[in-house]
Amino acid sequence: LDELAFLNQRHAKKHPEHADLAARMESYELAYRMQMEVPGVIDLKSEPELVREAYGMNQKETAGFGRQCLMARRLVEKGVRFVQIFSGGWDSHDYLERGHSSRIKSVDKPMTALIKDLKEKGMLEDTLVVWTGEFGRTPDNNRRGGVYALGRGHNIDAMTMLMAGGGVKKGSIVGS
């Protein structure tokens, strides 16, 4: 990279009329450095068994989301400023209790481990963890064919969000 930086600087001096050239070169260099870090971040075998167990990676129902949470922590450790992970299957219009109870089990342990891990490593105050969806749920049960479906419709006017770290005051509730 040093040789490349030297060549880029020499080229930029020869072409001062291209002011955006330096920014473009820096962007490419950053992308390269980030790509070089990826193999180390996704190789979770280097994590102690105790850590992998805390994230639920040894249990079928939590392994997938646990892997995402642990990789997210490792990306943050490497300086990545924004990490998004995903947990699907929450759009339950019927059989809400059954559907959500299994989804909750798949994310509870990994999310807890992520927050505890960030705190233990002294990273939680500088890292904002946000858990949210794109809409809330109506307060009443859906009715399908005259039968209550024990689910909820979409509510675009309300939603639930959990935030931890990043200077957010513990126990804060906004709204009613």
Question: Could you say what each language-model-derived stretch is?
Answer:
Residues 1-176:
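Ligand-binding pockets and gating/stacking loops
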